[in-house]
Amino acid sequence: MRGVDLRPLRLEDPFTRERLLSYIWADQPARAERLCHAIALNRARPPQIERASAAPWLAFQLAQPQREGACRVVMHSMVLQYLPEAERRAALTSIMAAGARATADRPFAWIGLEWNSDRSEVQLRLTRWPGEGGENGTSRVLAICHAYGSWIDWRG
């Protein structure tokens, strides 16, 4: 697993872990417990997070050769709303271009956890290339979720 962040956190640093926990209110022990589990998972199997801006990093990654038989996946959660408009457009353009290049031997999937267009719900959405019946960009909502992961209502 690879990822990108403008300022990746160093969870091996005790100060960083303590600071993260300080953002959780004392009356929210379930959130603190989830964060402690996430930190432990991260420390046991640290992801490869590179310091960079999202759109250029994504364009570079998606331009790399894809192994036959492997499904390339882009996953993001609650990030699009924070990207400047030009960067958001560039990232989405890279995703759509990767989808257009996908084949049955080199499929592509895009999984996003983001607000829907009218911000009435947070959707976990999967888009696949090639899609069902050979269609490109077949998309469906897998779940409706709490914005911070407190609950998930699976839809399929």
State what each model feature region is:
Residues 1-51, 63-67:
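Class I S-adenosyl-L-methionine-dependent methyltransferase module
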Residues 16, 22-34, 47, 89-91, ...:
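Domain-level detector for long C-terminal conserved domains
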Residues 45, 69-71, 106:
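Short coil/turn segments at beta-strand junctions that form active-site/ligand-binding loops
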Residues 52-57:
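Conserved SAM/SAH-binding loop
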Residues 58, 82-84, 119-122:
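Short active-site-adjacent structural elements
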Residues 58-60, 92-99:
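Short, well-ordered amphipathic alpha-helices
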Residues 72-85:
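A short SAM/SAH-binding and catalytic strip from SAM-dependent methyltransferases
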Residues 83-95:
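A short, conserved alpha-helix within the catalytic core of class I
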